[in-house]
C-alpha cells in the first residue's frame, strides 16, 4: 500500500481509538474538541525523532568537513617550491652549438610526468656543461614535485651528437617495509603491515608514504615513517616508528541543542568513546550515545546510540556503522496518551583514494544504508517504515586561493531490496528516492591590522527529484547550517545554505589555556517542499561567540539571532538563541 495512504489510515485509526477515550467527557465538555487536537498530535508523533535524526546528520557533515580540513593542513603543501629558472642567463652564452632535441627514457616504467614545461625552454639554447647542468636540475625538480624523492635523472650518454640531449630516469624503489628498522615479529606489527599498501618493489613516491602515515596514525597509535637506504642499489627501506597506548579516549559533553525549554528536553548529555588498534590492523572503533534531559523522565525520553568500525585496506577504507534512535512523548488533551518510536540504521561505506599528491586528494566512495522505523500510539503500532538507499560520491581536498578547499558531491538512489518501502512520492504515486547533494567548504588564513584571522565559507545543497519522506529531507536552522534557529526551522525536498565565519584566534601560551577564539558569522538558507503543501522558506541569521580550550575542557558559546525581513517564519523562530557545548576529554 502506498505510504501516504498508509499514513492517512494511521490517523483515521488513531482517531477511532481516541473516540473510546473522549466520548464520555465530550458529553459534559462539549465546548472542547479534544479529538481533533489529539489526532493532530498523533499525526505529528514522529516529529521529535525526525528532528533529532536531521540534526545528527547535519552534525556528522560538519564534523566530516572539519576532519578533511585537518587532513588538508597535514598533508597538502601551502606553496609550490620555487624552481630556479636560469634560461635567461644562458641566452648570453656564446657557444655555437645549440640544443636541438631533448629525450627522456623512463626506464620501462609506465609513469607519466610532464617534462615539456621545462624542456621547451631549453630548445635552441646554447649547448654547454652549464646548460646541461641547469636542465638536469630542473628535470630533477619535476621528479621531486611529483613525489619521487629517491629517484634521479641523468644523461643517458656523455656523448651528445647533433645537439640531441638524452636523459634517463633512475628510479628509486621500495625494498621492504620494516618496523624499527627490523622485520616485524610481533603479531600486531605483522597485522599492521598486512593492511598497508603493497609498495615492495615499486617506485617510491612520497605521497604513497603519506597514505601510510594517515593509515598508521590512529587514536591509540602514533607513527612516523623513515626512508632509509637499503643495501641494494637504488633501493630504500621504509622503517616505521610506532608508539601504542592501551586506554580508550573518552569524551563527556553537554549541549543545549533542543528547541524546547529545559523541562522539555533542551539539554542533551553525550558520551563518546574511541578506541583503535584493538586488532592491530590500524582499525578504529567508536561508540557514542546522546540522552535528552526531561523534567518528567518517565513520560518523555529521547536517546540515540551509535557504534562504528573503520578498517583501512591499502588505498581503500571500509566504514561500518550501526545506530539506534528512540523517543517517548506524552500527548496531552482531556486524556493523556503516549506516543513512541524508534529508528534502527546500518550503513556500509567503501571509499578509495583515486589520486593523491602535494596539492590534492581525490576519493570515490559508495555506501549502502538500511533503515527501519517503527511508530506507536500507546501500545498500538501505527507505522512501520523500511528504507534502503545507495549513495555514490566523490570527495576532493585541495589547495585553493592560499587556503584549503574540501568539496563533495553524491547521488542517492532508493532501493526496494527486502520489500523496502518507497522513500519519495509525487501527486500520482509513491516513488523511489533520487537526490543529488553536495557541499563546498573553503578555509583560509589572512591578516587584518597585523592580526592573524581565519575565514571559513560553507555551502551545502540538496536537490530531490520528487517529494521526500522524513529524514531524507534537507534541513536547515541549527548551529551547523543557518544559525539563529533550533530544531530544524525548515526542511524540504531541495534547498541550500551558505554559512560564513571569521575567527580571530588567540594563543595565550598559558599552561591552563590552549586557545581562545572569538568568531562572527552570517548565514542564509532556503528550502523548498512541494508536498503535502507547496512551501518555500528562506532563513537568515547572524552569530557571534567564542570557543576555548582549557586543558582537557573544551567550551563553545554562541549567541545567534534571525535576521528580520528575510523570509517568513513562525513567531517562535524570531527570538534569539544561545548554543552551548561543553566537553571534557580524557
From Swiss-Prot:
GO biological process: monoatomic ion transport; protein secretion by the type V secretion system
Subcellular location: Cell outer membrane
GO molecular function terms listed in the Swiss-Prot or TrEMBL record: porin activity; protein transmembrane transporter activity
This protein's record includes keyword Transmembrane helix: no
Superkingdom in the source lineage: Bacteria
Keywords: Cell outer membrane, Ion transport, Membrane, Porin, Protein transport, Signal, Transmembrane, Transmembrane beta strand, Transport
Domain POTRA: start-end pairs: 97-172
N-terminal signal peptide: 1-30
GO cellular component, one term: cell outer membrane
Principal subcellular localization: membrane
Keyword Ion transport included in the entry's annotation: yes
Domain comment as written in the entry: Probably a beta-barrel protein.
Family according to the record: Belongs to the TPS (TC 1.B.20) family.
Task of the protein: Possible member (with IbpA) of a two partner secretion pathway (TPS) in which it would mediate the secretion of protein IbpA (high molecular weight immunoglobulin-binding protein).
PANTHER family per record: OUTER MEMBRANE TRANSPORTER CDIB (PTHR34597:SF3), SLR1661 PROTEIN (PTHR34597)
Protein name, per record: Outer membrane transporter protein IbpB
Species lineage: Bacteria, Pseudomonadati, Pseudomonadota, Gammaproteobacteria, Pasteurellales
Gene field: ibpB
